[in-house]
Amino acid sequence: MTRNTKDVRLWLGVVLAVAVLLRVALFLTYPPVSYSDTSSYRRSAEAVLKGFEAYDGTRTPGYPAFLAVVGPDRAVYAAQLGLGLIITLSWFYIGLKASGNPVFGAAAALAHTLNPGQFFFEANLLTETLATFWLMLALFGAFLWLENPGLRKVWLGVLIGLCASLATLTRPLFIFMPVWLAVFLSFSFEGKKLKFNWRPLVGILLPAILLVGGWMRWIQVNYHVFSPSTMSGYHLVQHTGYYFEDVPDEYAVLRDIYLDYREQRIVERGTQGNTIWDAIPAMQEATGMNFYELSRTLQEISVQLILTHPFEFLSRVLRGWWLFWRAPVYWDSSVIAAPFWAGVMKVFITGARGLLFLTNLIFIITTAAAGISRRLRERWQLKPFLWLLAGSVWATSIFSSILDHGDNPRFLVPLQTAVVFWVMWMAASGWFNRRASGRELK
């Protein structure tokens, strides 16, 4: 057995030990946590079990189907912890193979598994862990494609497309991912020549068209809107609610109701964000519209407001984009029985959030710098997979900020480790260069 093989096994053992022990401890001491969205996912899961007869289209089917298959909250919690372990091991493999060093692989894996924003989400009955899992598998497949020319077959493209599509059906803000992956893997530079490979384009887009396109067609047939869900109009109001007083008199009833609820929300929370969810029942009662008619109407109103208030819309997009990088941790300190450990965890989370926010800022600066400077690209030895990660994060930050303005910090969670991986690569690139020089001297 070579020294390198021993090192790989040693660091893999360290990663496994830490990841398993952390999740066992979490499962034994911290319960599954429900949020305001959880009940709607459970309702949709019941509809899945009944053959979609009463499926209301408010949620894409990925997470409800997962809940339907797995069952009770505690079982879902355990399953999500298992998914977190698989994600951790995937980062170990990618870090190991990309750098050739098991220490870097272990650092990448532990950066994921020790991030409270990740392991606490594995306890939350929300979509993030499942979305992270499907995205990780899609990126893992893309890594294999880029690093192993012999694997560049249609079947691998289909698997990548399947995972990216399931990520979309779990968290619809990732609807761009199949197209992004297909385009990125289809084009490559050999020397100074741009090469095109049709296999990833066909392989990745085929399951996306069948799964995501098929689902959107189902929504269109049943609810008369071509969208991943029936909530599009409500999400747009998250943007336009800031200037809803400019809604035309034609929709005065909806406008006035929203403004009343907005004022109340600002008094209670200091922000108008998520006002629409409180206002929906009153809007339906006043207009006689059902949930879907109201969503379509609010979408029409919001599109008009955006067209007539482009700079206000842009300012909210930029605000949402900035919030995207804030590295939140969704957890419930009240369920930790021992006050001492709850206090320790609060300190740990504060420190982790500060470090992650700094990492996010470094990511923004270094990706922009690398895009401009050829010298930096060469110095940092940026492989195509690093650019794939960077592009995925940037696209998510922009796309999510355009579509919604409410829980923007939450939108980065599935790709937070991709940001950390990029920054770790920047930090270690000098060491990689020295190792390469040492091998050449030998």
Predicted regions: what they are:
Residues 29-43, 53-66, 74, 226-229, ...:
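Extracytoplasmic catalytic/substrate-binding loops of multi-pass membrane glycan-assembly enzymes
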Residues 74-78, 287, 298-299, 304-390, ...:
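Membrane-interface anchor segments at the N-terminal boundary of transmembrane helices
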Residues 78-99, 137, 141:
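Transmembrane-helix motifs of polytopic, lipid-linked glycan transferases
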Residues 99, 138-159, 185-186:
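Membrane-interface transmembrane helices that cradle and orient dolichyl/undecaprenyl
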